[in-house]
Amino acid sequence: MSDPNLNASHDSVESVEDELDIVEAADAVDPDEAELADAEAGAPAEEAALHVESDEDEDEADVEVDAAVEEAADDAEVAEEEAEEAAPVEPAEPVDPIQALREELRLLPGEWYVIHTYAGYEKRVKANLEQRAVSLNVEEFIYQAEVPEEEIVQIKNGERKNVRQNKLPGYVLVRMDLTNESWGVVRNTPGVTGFVGNAYDPYPLTLDEIVKMLAPEAQEKAAKAAAEEAGLPAPAVKRTIEVLDFEVGDSVTVTDGPFATLQATINEINPDSKKVKGLVEIFGRETPVELSFDQIQKN
């Protein structure tokens, strides 16, 4: 009869020995096989690492290519701009001053009217009207007043000089919207004697008429501006030559009109209107008269 305790002990010993054999077998694995296993295990990881490095290299290469393309584009743009700057600039076509004036006047608000003034008071009327338009709050109706002028050559006592004189003596041009209020402001301006045409419902000038009146000054200004821009002297302009032989205090004979053959003494000369004011003796009394240059002759 066998002892149960001995059998259990024997089984335990065998179990322990089996475990030791397993451990030793594991330790006794061929080194070459281990290295092969390690190599097989590490190959995918190494391949993955190489793939990552390759992607990074490709990204860097793409960035460098993009930078090079952008730099080349910038260089091309700069070169194009420099070429445009270096290219000769074609001179602009000359602008017709009359056509430019016509277009400017056509776009302005209001219409142009002509008012009568006392001779020699044109500039004073212009200044008074501009001041009254502001002080009476009618600037939205009365826009502009103009006294057309021209430059002439005046010869007096042998001395020659250029002077500016009114082109329309006794008249002032006004650009305005005609209302009862604006009409009253203009009509009651000191020095104004009335509107040209219908006194209470005057007719405005046409565009052609106002262009014709203002064109000479516009042409002269355009010619001077073009000469200055080109660095040239102002172009010569044909001037009217006026010989003025009268002086205040001169005794003259009236040659035309109701006072013909009478003697007069000049006390005022107005070159703009080409008129003089003087005293004529009628029935033993001195009477003030206004005479034009062609109505008198120096004694």
UniProtKB/Swiss-Prot annotation:
HAMAP family found in the cross-reference section: NusG (MF_00948)
Q: Where is this region: 4 X 4 AA repeats of E-E-A-A?
A: 46-87
Highest rank taxon of the organism: Bacteria
Task: Map the sequence repeats onto residue numbers.
Answer: 46-49, 70-73, 80-83, 84-87
One GO cellular component term: cytosol
Q: What PROSITE patterns does its record include? A: NUSG (PS01014)
Q: Any idea what this protein is called?
A: Transcription termination/antitermination protein NusG
Please list the residue ranges annotated as the KOW domain: 248-276
GO BP, one annotated term: regulation of DNA-templated transcription elongation
Q: Which NCBIfam families does the record associate with it? A: nusG
What does the UniProt keyword field contain? Repeat, Transcription, Transcription antitermination, Transcription regulation, Transcription termination
Q: Where is the composition biased (Acidic residues)?
A: 54-87
InterPro entries referenced in this protein's UniProt entry, alphabetically: KOW, NGN, NGN-like_dom, NGN_dom_sf, NusG-like, Rib_uL2_dom2, Transcrpt_antiterm_NusG, Transcrpt_antiterm_NusG_bac_CS
Q: How is it modified after translation?
A: The N-terminus is blocked.
- Location of the region described as Disordered in the Swiss-Prot/TrEMBL record: 30-96
The keyword Repeat belongs to this UniProt entry's keyword annotation: yes
* Transferase recorded as keyword: no
